[in-house]
């Protein structure tokens, strides 16, 4: 069996969570010895399409006419499109209609969580929908004290500094405004945000947040995977202040690095993240502040070993087997 992993604008998307998810797919298929190509002109048995762009839609239509089987990967929903870029809320209903048009071309649809599956079903999509996590590369994200020290050295943090990390594009949905507010309220802590997107496309509130000047706040921009791993090992707490996700890859990576974390209590995490069991959860800035202080002071016990089980369940080999089962189901 040979799979076409197709993603238009791959270079542009490479710096996003979607780009990371596609790399994970490649590693997952390698882990279970499934051959793949990224060139639609090559011979292949089944197409796995990762994006909702016009090129992807046209390719899917063309392959359907040729009798090829298609797996469409639903990484995006109307819900996680909202509160992202300028005018995203105004056009979200049109975006949803377009997603439905694309996704329903699949003989099967893959989406990362039960939550995103329910959203797709609420759109009226009747195609078979399979839940497969985006997964994590355990060999690239692991507990590494040396990597943590390198992170602190690289960004001029002292050994005694208490560091809070956030990761994501410059969009409101990712909780970047709350991250800046936490930095304002917690001047004794160091806050550093990794990730970047052009501010020209960001909403006014986000631009204001990113341009905030505080002695304890750093916007480090886009960095490579190695630096993210170092940061997750070198920080005291990783916070996922996101308001909406289809999964949240960085949470799985933080779990793999055995990083203390606080995540927002939102529906996508129901069923696999549990407050006080494998992560700590918060609903607003005040609760994030309290949880961070209690983790750093030791009032709250560390849950990193319990969180690691999340990553272990989502390692490449397991994801590869699930992808293989979906492909075989379409081809048989």
Where are these regions (language model features)?
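A charged, aromatic-enriched C-terminal amphipathic alpha-helix characteristic of glycosyltransferases
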Residues: 17, 301-328
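Glycosyltransferase donor-sugar binding loop
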Residues: 136, 167, 190-205
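Short hydrophobic beta-strand element within catalytic cores of glycosyltransferases
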Residues: 260-263
């Amino acid at each position: 069996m040979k799979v076409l992993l197709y993603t238009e604008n791959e270079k542009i998307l490479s710096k996003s969570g979607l780009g990371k998810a596609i790399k994970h797919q490649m590693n997952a298929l390698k882990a279970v010895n499934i051959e793949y190509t990224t060139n639609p002109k090559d011979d292949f048995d089944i197409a796995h399409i990762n994006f909702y762009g016009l090129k992807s839609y046209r390719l899917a239509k063309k392959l359907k006419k040729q009798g090829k089987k298609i797996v469409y990967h639903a990484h995006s929903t109307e819900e996680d499109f909202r509160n992202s870029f300028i005018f995203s809320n105004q056009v979200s209903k049109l975006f949803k209609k377009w997603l439905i048009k694309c996704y329903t071309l699949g003989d099967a649809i893959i989406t990362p969580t039960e939550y995103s599956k329910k959203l797709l079903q609420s759109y009226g999509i009747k195609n078979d929908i399979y839940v497969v996590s985006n997964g994590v590369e355990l060999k690239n994200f692991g507990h590494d004290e040396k990597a943590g020290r390198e992170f602190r050295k690289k960004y001029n943090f002292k050994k005694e500094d208490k560091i809070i990390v956030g990761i994501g594009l410059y969009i409101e949905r990712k909780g970047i405004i709350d991250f800046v507010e936490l930095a304002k309220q917690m001047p004794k802590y160091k806050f550093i945000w990794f990730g970047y997107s052009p501010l020209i496309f960001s909403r006014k509130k986000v631009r204001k947040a990113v341009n905030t000047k505080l002695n304890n706040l750093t916007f480090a921009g886009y960095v490579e995977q190695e630096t993210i791993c170092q940061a997750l090992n070198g920080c005291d707490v990783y916070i996922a202040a996101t308001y909406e996700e289809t999964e949240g890859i960085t949470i799985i990576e933080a779990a793999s690095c055995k990083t203390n974390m606080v995540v927002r209590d939102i529906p996508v995490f129901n069923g696999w993240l549990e407050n006080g069991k494998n992560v700590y959860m918060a609903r607003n800035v005040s609760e994030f502040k309290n949880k961070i202080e209690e983790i750093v002071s030791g009032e709250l016990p560390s849950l990193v070993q319990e969180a690691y089980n999340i990553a272990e369940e989502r390692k490449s080999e397991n994801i590869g087997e699930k992808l293989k089962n979906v492909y075989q189901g379409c081809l048989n």
